[in-house]
């Protein structure tokens, strides 16, 4: 995007844990809890999964006795990204000391192969490990929504402010416990008590209807509509002169330099090597 003309309107969008740089874009859509006039809208990645959101929003209206009877497994996890936060590995190992955690992805697969339908796989389990790639305020992804839609109790680690949107009575927050041992003891308690388990399913997932998918998609449409119906000269928001122009010119030079391109390729190479080594290691251990 650095090569785009200076008078172009730039809209930053991310599905990753990245904050927008308003020196480089006019508008942004992301995960951050922030307001910036008409330049920013919070629209987490999980809203791009409307069917799953609908299941999640209505899960407390189901026949909960039937849901309880459908649970034949203890806990599920479906992960194929081998570059995980260390907390995820620790949590998996600690829960596995209590009961087998069924891993249906490439990572530590222990069920004989990758699952084809994650939602159906999760539906047969009482709990599901849900760990974000990193812990950052506002960074809640589809992982939590998918587990809730599958009528699991998510064992969640990630966004420290997840309870601004999601009802804390519908999931177990790892961050609420001083140690993983303490957490596992509570999971054991819920696992052994059917009434306590069902109490998590009885609660509405969202704390406020403003966070339901239909409302948020409507707000996104208004946000985009405002940008494209505003005359070009008035829609421009970022500084394009003096220090603003110098900032962009510097970034263009950096991203176009040989050292930048070499460094980028080097980091990708290292990332790929680490990923493949981890895949080989866990593939060998799983034999």
What label would you give each PLM region?
Residues 1-6, 11, 19-102, 112-130, ...:
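Pol beta-like nucleotidyltransferase catalytic core
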Residues 15:
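Nucleotide-sugar donor phosphate/pyrophosphate-binding loop at the beta->alpha transition
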Residues 105:
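Short loop/edge segments at beta-strand edges and connector loops
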């Amino acid at each position: 995007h650095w090569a785009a003309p200076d008078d172009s309107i730039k809209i930053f969008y991310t599905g990753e844990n990245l904050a927008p740089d308003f020196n480089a874009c006019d508008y942004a859509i992301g995960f951050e809890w922030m307001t910036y006039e008409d330049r920013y809208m919070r629209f987490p990645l999980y809203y791009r999964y409307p069917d799953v959101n609908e299941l999640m929003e209505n899960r407390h209206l189901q026949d909960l006795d039937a849901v309880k009877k459908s649970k034949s497994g203890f806990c599920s996890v479906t992960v194929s990204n081998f570059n995980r936060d260390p907390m995820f590995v620790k949590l998996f190992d600690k829960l596995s000391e209590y009961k087998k955690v069924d891993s249906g992805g490439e990572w530590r697969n222990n069920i004989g192969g990758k699952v084809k339908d994650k939602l159906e796989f999760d539906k047969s389990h009482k709990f599901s490990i849900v760990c974000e790639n990193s812990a950052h305020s506002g960074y809640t992804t589809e992982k939590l929504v998918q587990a809730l839609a599958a009528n699991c109790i998510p064992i969640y680690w990630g966004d420290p402010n997840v309870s601004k949107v999601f009802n804390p009575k519908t999931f177990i927050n790892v961050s609420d416990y001083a140690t993983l041992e303490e957490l596992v003891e509570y999971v054991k308690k819920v696992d052994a008590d059917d009434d306590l388990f069902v109490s998590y399913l009885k609660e509405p997932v969202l704390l406020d209807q403003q966070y339901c998918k239909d409302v948020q998609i409507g707000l996104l449409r208004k946000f985009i509509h405002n940008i494209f119906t505003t005359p070009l000269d008035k829609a421009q928001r970022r500084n394009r002169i003096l220090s603003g122009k110098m900032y962009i010119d510097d970034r263009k030079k950096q991203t176009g330099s040989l050292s930048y391109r070499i460094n980028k390729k080097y980091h990708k190479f290292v990332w790929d090597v680490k990923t493949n080594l981890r895949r080989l290691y866990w593939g060998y251990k799983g034999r």
